[in-house]
From Swiss-Prot:
Residues 292-351 bind DNA. Keywords: Developmental protein, DNA-binding, Homeobox, Nucleus, Phosphoprotein, Transcription, Transcription regulation. GO terms for biological process: brain development; endothelial cell development; regulation of transcription by RNA polymerase II. It is found in: Nucleus. This is POU domain, class 3, transcription factor 2. It comes from Danio rerio.
Length: 378
């Protein structure tokens, strides 16, 4: 078998030309087709009734790790080198092959004339056990037609691309299988669990309504005001809430988002208040933690009449007048000042927007004479 292959190999290498290429031509040489015709005619049918070439069996044997009969023969390598390294000598004799007949079933379609005219194709490369370019990758590959195409000497442009892609995918497939899909499943499961957990923690409107009702009942039973709760929250948790906020929470007048935020704080305050409700000073301690408000001042009727008479004379007294009036009425200076401020605000509320009430100009005594009643223009 090796002898027969060697004879055909010598016939192929003794062919006057292997490659035919002209700069302005869109067709390739016929030497490759003639050589292929020779191989197909000699090895037309095998035992499995497929017209497979003998070269394909050698390539298949090499791809499965079987040693080729020429792998250890230095003579074969010496015979191969002239065919690979001297394409120019073979191209000069291409004019003799132009008039040869071309079988219609072996017409080769080119992809364009953008390839170098030095590109060569030969089936003798199918018998080569291994050929490596400068980057050390094999140039032998098989296609459905069991031929070798696109081999350019001294460069790696003819390397089979999908074999490199397969090697690249095989190299990266463990990485993708180990670090690609399982983390995405883990992230998806963690995200799903977090989403379920957040749905369980979010109360419904019915839960908020029931909690607000229970909170108000327990707060009143413990003796705390809404202001006390707001101040206690500021002392315990750092967030001071006004009495209006607690009132709106109990009346379900806050937004759903704010109700959800305030509910756990009020729940903790209830637990804290229940744990300290046994001591007699628990209410005083929580109340003392808040703001200190001044005691409301109550003024007697006689003192209030004296202030009213002074207000009619001078609604905005000076600081010296406020001091003397406070001493005469035995009141604090701040109390007298605040009373006059409140009285002026009350007067503004009582005065209509169109102007002062009739007769108030004479009372205050600061209205100019020409601002009296105007006569209509005739």
């Amino acid at each position: 078998m090796a002898t027969t292959a060697s004879n055909h190999y010598n016939i192929l290498t003794s062919s006057p030309s292997i490659v035919h290429s002209e700069p302005g031509s869109m067709q390739q040489a016929t030497a490759y087709r003639d050589a292929q015709t020779l191989l197909q005619s000699d090895y037309s049918l095998q035992s499995n009734s497929h017209p497979l070439s003998h070269a394909h069996q050698w390539i298949t044997a090499l791809s499965h790790g079987e040693g080729g009969p020429w792998s250890s023969s230095p003579l074969g390598e010496q015979d191969i080198k002239p065919a690979v390294q001297s394409p120019r000598d073979e191209m000069h004799n291409s004019s003799n092959l132009q008039h040869q007949s071309r079988p219609p079933h072996l017409v080769h379609q080119t992809h364009g004339n953008h390839h170098d005219s030095r590109a060569w194709r030969t089936t003798t490369a199918a018998h080569i056990p291994s050929m490596a370019t400068s980057n050390g990758q094999s140039l032998i590959y098989s296609q459905p037609s069991f031929s070798v195409n696109g081999l350019i000497p001294g460069s790696g442009q003819g390397i089979h691309h999908h074999s490199m892609r397969d090697a690249h995918e095989d190299h990266h497939s463990p990485h993708l299988s180990d670090h690609g899909h399982p983390p995405s499943q883990h992230q998806h499961q963690s995200h799903q669990s977090h989403h379920d957990h957040s749905d369980e923690d979010t109360p419904t409107s019915d839960d908020l309504e029931q909690f607000a009702k229970q909170f108000k009942q327990r707060r009143i039973k413990l003796g705390f005001t809404q202001a006390d709760v707001g101040l206690a929250l500021g002392t315990l948790y750092g967030n001071v809430f006004s009495q209006t906020t607690i009132c709106r929470f109990e009346a379900l007048q806050l937004s759903f988002k704010n109700m959800c935020k305030l509910k756990p704080l009020l729940n903790k305050w209830l637990e804290e208040a229940d744990s300290t409700s046994g001591s007699p000073t628990s209410l005083d301690k929580i109340a003392a933690q808040g703001r200190k408000r001044k005691k409301r001042t109550s003024i007697e009727v006689s003192v209030k009449g004296a202030l009213e008479s002074h207000f009619l004379k001078c609604p905005k007294p000076a600081a010296s007048e406020i001091t003397s009036l406070a001493d005469s009425l035995q009141l604090e200076k701040e109390v007298v000042r605040v009373w006059f401020c409140n009285r002026r605000q009350k007067e503004k509320r009582m005065t209509p927007p169109g102007g002062p009430l009739p007769g108030t100009e004479d009372v205050y005594g600061d209205t100019p004479p020409h601002h009296g009643v105007q006569t209509p223009v005739q």
